[in-house]
Amino acid sequence: MKNLHIMEWYDKYLSIYEKPYSEVPQTVVEGCRERLAKLQSYEPLVSIVIVAYNEERRLPACLWSLSEQQCKYPIEFIGVDNESKDRTAEIYQAFGVPYYTEHQHTCGYARQCGLNQAKGRITMCIDCDTMYPPHYIELMVDNLQQPGISAVAAMWSYYPNEDHSKLQMKMYEFFRDCYLKIQNINRPELTVRGLAFGYYTENALKEGYRVELLRGEDGSMALSMKKYGKIKFVYDKRCRVITGYGGLKEKSILAAMWHRLKFYGVGRLFSKTDHYEDAPDNFLKNK
């Protein structure tokens, strides 16, 4: 008896994920371009900022998922190319996404570049190696506009592959999510990831990204958003995004779980802080 495969919302996007741009069907590109153009507003409430650096193999799938957003709010798409050496810029052009080139190479610089161009009252951060379910933007904005909320974030899953079965990933994500939900009580800024993060543009422009950081610019921005209200995590499964394995270096799920528990520990789960020491090796080195 053949194994039955239950179709997931992201399966069609995986059909081009990690493939060279030359293998992406032109019908997919043209369809996405048409849908993105219909969604693009000149008077947006929400600015969707997509950052990419050498992401030819992943950006098309991300844009495909964004082109199928079902959103009641006016939105705009802004691409940022962090001076890629591959066909990233060409992909933005082919899909009809207005984009800017940021020559300084950190995620902070790229996100700040997009933030500076945002016309919407709300900015939603998008990572180009990530795929977004169809109601993601609308639901995140719904939650952000609730009283007392200054920022929103969502959870993420990894797609199954040859090294990680669906069952393995479900187990890993169950324990990881439990840890993150507890951590979110006292230190939500540590749970935020830039791939699923949104805030009010005006507040973010006042604070600015810490562009000198090699990593953690998203958590730093989240920390600064606490001045303006509460960071809300949206646990609705319709907001759970699917991403690649860039943030999961270990092939073994048990090794990944042990590494995170050993590195992060449990002590910080039960205390609050508004200050973190920067690691000396986490700064952009001037050339």
For each feature predicted by the language model, list its residue ranges:
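A conserved acidic beta->alpha catalytic loop
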Residues: 65, 81-89, 130
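Glycine-rich, basic loop-to-helix element that forms the pyrophosphate-binding segment
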Residues: 102-118
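Acidic donor-binding loop at a coil-to-helix junction in glycosyltransferase catalytic cores
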Residues: 215-221
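Conserved donor NDP-sugar-binding/catalytic core segment of glycosyltransferases
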Residues: 135-166
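Short, flexible, basic/aromatic active-site loop/helix in glycosyltransferases
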Residues: 154-160, 168-190
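N-proximal low-complexity "stem/linker" segments adjacent to membrane-targeting elements
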Residues: 1-65
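Acidic helix N-cap motif at the loop->helix transition within catalytic regions
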Residues: 57-60, 84-93, 135
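Short aromatic/hydrophobic "clamp" motif used to bind/position activated sugar donors
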Residues: 123
